[in-house]
Amino acid sequence: MIWTAVIKGSALMTFVQGAMALVDKVFGEEILPHRIYSSGEAAQLLGMERLQVLEMVRAGTIKAKKVGDNYRILGSNLVEYMNR
């Protein structure tokens, strides 16, 4: 009986993970203002190379915070850049 519940729970989790992956794929191009993006993710969303994003961050064109050796960019900063 317990194994039946475990198997059903596992199947449900697999379904939920698949649904979440599908939602990410369908809506993945939308920039979420409160999400934090890496420079690579930002480059993909903006349709440019990562190095271009890093140059823009260093020039102050796109606002970002340096965390360790990497930059993190708030989605609202990407939206702000795109609306210029």
Curated annotation (Swiss-Prot):
It comes from Magnetospirillum gryphiswaldense (strain DSM 6361 / JCM 21280 / NBRC 15271 / MSR-1). This is Magnetosome protein MamR. It comes from the Bacteria. May play a role in controlling magnetite number and size. Coexpression of mamLQRBIEMO in a deletion of the 17 gene mamAB operon restores magnetosome vesicle formation but not magnetite biosynthesis. The lineage of its organism: Bacteria, Pseudomonadati, Pseudomonadota, Alphaproteobacteria, Rhodospirillales. Signal peptide: none annotated. It is found in: Magnetosome. GO terms for molecular function: DNA binding. This bacteria makes up to 60 cubo-octahedral magnetosomes of about 45 nm in diameter which contain membrane-bound crystals of magnetite (Fe(3)O(4)).
